[in-house]
């Protein structure tokens, strides 16, 4: 076991030396198992240039997960300021790199991907894109798949709350097996998005979880461009009436929902999520009786969206009967974020008005819980 650890330390040293050699102009020396203050570093590498000396403190791990990265980074932040704290592991996942950056800790992997940053940015090395072989962990649930994302949606909807596994499984907007919730819980904890405190699941990083969900979010299962007589608002009225007359659940979405959540969001093409039943041929053909609704290749003023999962309708009830149902701020953000240009601007407006404060307060609450444990 000791030999394996020593071999990994030598590997880490060689990779860092190679990175510094690529830059040129450094004289490099190293020490293994060196004590620095109250801490002990696996490897300390000293890199001297003509006008500066940089000391890199390497913590070497055979395998590192986002969950273990958090505690490791908290410890490494206590190192003296003249050291550049760096994690080395053969494989560094994007999530581990993200957490390390959040704490101001550097990282290096076997392939040479790295971020090394000294105080005052006198040294800044950021290399990405080198392929590192990795295998996905077995038996781990993808939290962003259609069913699993229902769990994520419920957690983000009340980010300061603690949840029991069964409570999540039985939530009206979730309704999945206890087994799936347990798997997703494990993934969220291991990926550093959540913690378990007194047998309750809390979100540690709701902002990061939402950002990564947005990157993976697939959008509607189907999009049908439609034209109705009149403008986008008239098209929304026509589809709303068609849905009511045929008892079809629906919700204004995309820019249509964004405008109602943040008035600065402007749109000339509406979007509406319609329950799968609305796509049945017999029901769909009735749209022609509503402002001449028809499918078009160009010139659409409304996009008819088939949901990837019924959870898009969560929290879509209108504030009053006079208003049409629209997607929640969370769902609206996801749909707008995937649209380039104005979509991203609109997503930011919705986020700032309706999501940012709640998510940040949730993260603050979890930090308080963690401090209570110390």
Predicted segments with their positions:
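Acidic-basic catalytic patches of nuclease active cores, encompassing PD-(D/E)XK
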Residues: 1-35
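A short alpha->loop->secondary-structure connector
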Residues: 102-115, 122-126
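Short gly/ser-rich loop at a beta-strand->alpha-helix junction or flexible surface loop bordering the NTP-binding
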Residues: 221-310
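Short alpha-helical segments that sit at the start of domains
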Residues: 123-152
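Nucleic-acid nuclease catalytic cores
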Residues: 80-104, 108
């Amino acid at each position: 076991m000791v030999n394996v650890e020593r071999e990994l330390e030598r590997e880490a040293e060689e990779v860092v030396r190679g990175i510094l050699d690529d830059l040129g102009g450094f004289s490099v020396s190293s020490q293994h198992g060196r004590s620095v203050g109250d801490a002990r570093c696996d490897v300390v590498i000293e890199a001297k240039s003509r006008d500066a000396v940089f000391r890199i403190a390497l913590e070497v791990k055979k395998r590192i997960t986002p969950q273990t990265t958090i505690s490791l980074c908290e410890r490494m932040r206590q190192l003296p300021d003249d050291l550049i704290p760096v994690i080395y592991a053969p494989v560094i996942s994007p999530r581990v790199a993200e957490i390390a950056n959040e704490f101001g800790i550097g990282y290096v992997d076997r392939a040479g991907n790295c971020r090394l940053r000294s105080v005052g940015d006198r040294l800044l090395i950021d290399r990405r894109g080198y392929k590192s072989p990795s295998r996905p962990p077995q038996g781990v649930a993808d939290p962003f798949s259609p069913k699993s994302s229902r769990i994520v949606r419920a957690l983000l909807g009340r980010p300061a709350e603690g949840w029991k596994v069964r409570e999540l499984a039985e939530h009206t907007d979730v309704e999945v097996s206890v087994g799936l919730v347990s798997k997703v819980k494990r993934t969220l904890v291991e990926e550093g998005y959540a913690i378990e405190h007194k047998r309750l699941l809390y979100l540690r990083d709701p902002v990061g979880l939402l950002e990564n969900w947005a990157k993976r979010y697939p959008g509607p299962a189907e999009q049908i461009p439609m034209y109705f007589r009149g403008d986008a608002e008239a098209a929304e009225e026509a589809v709303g009436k068609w849905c009511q007359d045929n008892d079809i659940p629906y919700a204004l979405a995309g820019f249509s929902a964004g405008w109602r959540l943040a008035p600065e969001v402007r749109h000339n093409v509406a979007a509406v999520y319609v329950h799968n039943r609305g796509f049945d041929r017999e029901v769909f053909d009735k749209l022609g009786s509503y402002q001449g609704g028809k499918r078009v290749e160009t010139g659409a003023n409304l996009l008819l969206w088939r949901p990837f999962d019924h959870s898009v309708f969560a929290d879509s009830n209108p504030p009053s009967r006079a208003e049409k149902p629209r997607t929640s701020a969370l769902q609206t953000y996801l749909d707008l974020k995937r649209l380039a240009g104005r979509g991203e601007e609109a997503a930011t407006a919705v986020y700032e008005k309706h999501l940012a404060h709640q998510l940040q307060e949730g993260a603050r609450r979890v930090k308080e819980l963690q401090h209570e444990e110390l």
